[in-house]
Amino acid sequence: MTAQQLVDAILGLGVTIQPHPSNEQDCQYQSPDDPGRQDRSSVTLQEGVLLSEWASGHRVMEIGTGLGVSTVALAHHADFVHTIDPSEWVRSALTMPQNVRQWASVEDVPGTFGRIFIDGLHDFASVCKDIESALLMLSPEGQVAFHDMCQSDVRAAVDSFDWKDRIEYPTVGLLTFCMVKA
């Protein structure tokens, strides 16, 4: 998936994309159902392309859908994406791709996942809970990716777990990929 393909997919949802006024590498999105509402996704186009490649050929769980930008990127090459976010706006305004299903809570989702992307609440306790839930659903060779590692509670929560391997992409944005310790 190229950045242009991601932009085209997002535009296909009816969402308007504009450069974010305070960060040229970021985007601001406008809901087609609520033109007065401006939302910002911190998932950059470059991160979206990387997420798309990372998810390729896997069953994916996304914890924290937000505006659905990362969901679109994950779904582009994933076998199937299950996404968790209680956002009413997401449920009412976002038309998910055919290989995406949205759930109310992690406990409702059946099966295991080869890739889990966590970008939910950003306080320490919530991130730890998301990690614990993810580890219960992760396949033996699975990987977990985190967004917003620049936030101190997110970094502290990720650091509090024992990972087999960890790869950070500070030049790509705020993504960190972790593999479960064997």
Identify the residue ranges that each predicted region occupies:
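A short alpha-helical cap/connector motif
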Residues: 1-117, 121-182
